[in-house]
Protein backbone atom coordinates (compact mmCIF):
# COMPACT_ATOMS: atom_id res chain seq x y z
CA UNK A 1 0.00 0.00 0.00
CA UNK A 2 1.25 3.44 -0.91
CA UNK A 3 0.77 6.21 1.63
CA UNK A 4 1.01 9.97 1.16
CA UNK A 5 -0.13 13.17 2.85
CA UNK A 6 -2.57 15.68 1.41
CA UNK A 7 -2.28 19.12 2.93
CA UNK A 8 -3.96 22.44 2.33
CA UNK A 9 -2.39 25.75 3.27
CA UNK A 10 -4.77 28.51 4.33
CA UNK A 11 -3.43 31.96 5.10
CA UNK A 12 -5.47 34.13 7.44
CA UNK A 13 -4.61 37.82 7.45
CA UNK A 14 -6.10 40.94 8.94
CA UNK A 15 -7.47 43.36 6.33
CA UNK A 16 -4.65 45.84 6.95
CA UNK A 17 -2.12 43.08 6.13
CA UNK A 18 -3.53 42.38 2.66
CA UNK A 19 -1.64 43.21 -0.52
CA UNK A 20 -3.38 45.34 -3.14
CA UNK A 21 -4.41 42.24 -5.12
CA UNK A 22 -5.62 40.44 -2.00
CA UNK A 23 -7.77 43.48 -1.13
CA UNK A 24 -9.27 43.41 -4.63
CA UNK A 25 -10.00 39.67 -4.28
CA UNK A 26 -11.65 40.21 -0.89
CA UNK A 27 -13.81 42.98 -2.34
CA UNK A 28 -14.83 40.76 -5.28
CA UNK A 29 -15.63 37.87 -2.92
CA UNK A 30 -17.72 40.18 -0.72
CA UNK A 31 -19.58 41.53 -3.77
CA UNK A 32 -20.29 37.95 -4.86
CA UNK A 33 -22.11 37.21 -1.58
CA UNK A 34 -24.89 39.49 -2.81
CA UNK A 35 -25.39 37.20 -5.81
CA UNK A 36 -25.73 34.14 -3.59
CA UNK A 37 -28.94 32.14 -3.81
CA UNK A 38 -29.19 30.77 -0.28
CA UNK A 39 -32.84 30.82 0.85
CA UNK A 40 -32.44 27.68 2.97
CA UNK A 41 -29.23 28.27 4.93
CA UNK A 42 -29.36 32.07 4.71
CA UNK A 43 -25.54 31.84 4.72
CA UNK A 44 -24.32 33.82 1.71
CA UNK A 45 -20.84 32.92 0.50
CA UNK A 46 -18.75 34.52 -2.21
CA UNK A 47 -15.41 33.45 -3.63
CA UNK A 48 -12.95 35.10 -5.97
CA UNK A 49 -9.91 33.62 -7.67
CA UNK A 50 -6.93 35.30 -9.25
CA UNK A 51 -5.63 33.34 -12.22
CA UNK A 52 -2.01 33.15 -13.38
CA UNK A 53 -2.83 35.45 -16.31
CA UNK A 54 -4.14 38.11 -13.87
CA UNK A 55 -7.83 37.52 -14.56
CA UNK A 56 -10.21 37.59 -11.61
CA UNK A 57 -13.33 35.41 -11.48
CA UNK A 58 -15.97 35.46 -8.74
CA UNK A 59 -18.80 33.12 -7.81
CA UNK A 60 -21.37 32.56 -5.08
CA UNK A 61 -23.11 29.65 -3.42
CA UNK A 62 -26.27 28.41 -5.15
CA UNK A 63 -28.73 26.31 -3.13
CA UNK A 64 -31.87 24.44 -4.08
CA UNK A 65 -34.49 22.35 -2.31
CA UNK A 66 -32.86 19.10 -3.44
CA UNK A 67 -30.15 19.39 -0.77
CA UNK A 68 -27.21 18.68 -1.11
CA UNK A 69 -27.19 19.28 -4.84
CA UNK A 70 -26.44 23.01 -4.58
CA UNK A 71 -22.93 24.32 -5.15
CA UNK A 72 -20.54 26.13 -2.87
CA UNK A 73 -19.13 29.49 -3.91
CA UNK A 74 -15.62 28.08 -4.25
CA UNK A 75 -16.60 25.39 -6.76
CA UNK A 76 -18.94 27.72 -8.66
CA UNK A 77 -16.04 30.15 -9.02
CA UNK A 78 -13.40 27.54 -9.85
CA UNK A 79 -15.53 25.65 -12.36
CA UNK A 80 -16.43 28.85 -14.21
CA UNK A 81 -12.78 29.99 -14.18
CA UNK A 82 -11.64 26.65 -15.58
CA UNK A 83 -14.25 26.65 -18.35
CA UNK A 84 -13.63 30.31 -19.27
CA UNK A 85 -9.81 30.31 -18.87
CA UNK A 86 -8.72 26.65 -19.26
CA UNK A 87 -5.03 27.49 -19.75
CA UNK A 88 -4.67 29.78 -16.73
CA UNK A 89 -4.22 28.03 -13.36
CA UNK A 90 -5.57 29.48 -10.13
CA UNK A 91 -3.00 31.56 -8.26
CA UNK A 92 -5.06 32.29 -5.15
CA UNK A 93 -8.59 32.10 -3.75
CA UNK A 94 -10.44 34.41 -1.37
CA UNK A 95 -13.68 33.53 0.45
CA UNK A 96 -16.16 35.89 2.14
CA UNK A 97 -19.42 35.08 3.89
CA UNK A 98 -22.40 36.84 5.40
CA UNK A 99 -24.33 35.22 8.26
CA UNK A 100 -28.09 35.02 8.72
CA UNK A 101 -28.13 38.64 9.98
CA UNK A 102 -26.56 39.76 6.70
CA UNK A 103 -23.30 40.78 8.36
CA UNK A 104 -19.92 39.60 7.12
CA UNK A 105 -18.39 36.92 9.30
CA UNK A 106 -15.41 37.89 11.40
CA UNK A 107 -13.96 34.38 11.48
CA UNK A 108 -12.41 32.80 8.39
CA UNK A 109 -14.57 30.48 6.30
CA UNK A 110 -12.76 27.30 5.26
CA UNK A 111 -13.62 25.33 2.11
CA UNK A 112 -15.67 22.16 2.65
CA UNK A 113 -14.28 18.74 1.77
CA UNK A 114 -15.74 18.74 -1.75
CA UNK A 115 -14.23 22.17 -2.43
CA UNK A 116 -10.87 21.08 -1.01
CA UNK A 117 -10.89 18.12 -3.39
CA UNK A 118 -11.73 20.41 -6.32
CA UNK A 119 -8.88 22.73 -5.28
CA UNK A 120 -6.50 19.79 -5.04
CA UNK A 121 -7.41 18.63 -8.53
CA UNK A 122 -7.14 22.16 -9.92
CA UNK A 123 -3.46 22.40 -8.94
Give the location of each predicted region.
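Zn2+-dependent cytidine deaminase-like catalytic core
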Residues: 58-123
